[in-house]
Amino acid sequence: MSTKKSPEELKRIFEKYAAKEGDPDQLSKDELKLLIQAEFPSLLKGPNTLDDLFQELDKNGDGEVSFEEFQVLVKKISQ
């Protein structure tokens, strides 16, 4: 996935994975894993593990990643 996507495209990608289980406005850890494996596979090849990445993104500690929290990941990888 190119990080040069419009906000609308990023929202659509987020919603595609968030709708797989539970709250359609939040990514569970499993949904985040599927999204990263499909859209950002290189993220899990370095020192970052899925657990570390999930903890970093889940700023409010609710066990899920909102679209706002997901945008942190997009900004991080587009730098």
UniProtKB/Swiss-Prot annotation:
Residues 13-48, 45-79 form the EF-hand domain. Ca(2+) 2 binds at residues 58, 60, 62, 64, 69. It comes from Homo sapiens. The keyword Transit peptide does not apply. The modification N-acetylserine is found at residue 2. The lineage of its organism: Eukaryota, Metazoa, Chordata, Craniata, Vertebrata. CDD domains: S-100 (cd00213). This is Protein S100-G. GO terms for cellular component: apical plasma membrane; basolateral plasma membrane; cytoplasm. Keywords: Acetylation, Calcium, Metal-binding, Phosphoprotein, Repeat, Vitamin D. InterPro entries: EF-hand-dom_pair, EF_Hand_1_Ca_BS, EF_hand_dom, S-100_dom, S100/CaBP7/8-like_CS, S100_Ca-bd_sub. PANTHER family: PROTEIN S100-G (PTHR11639:SF73), S100 CALCIUM-BINDING PROTEIN (PTHR11639). The keyword Membrane does not apply.
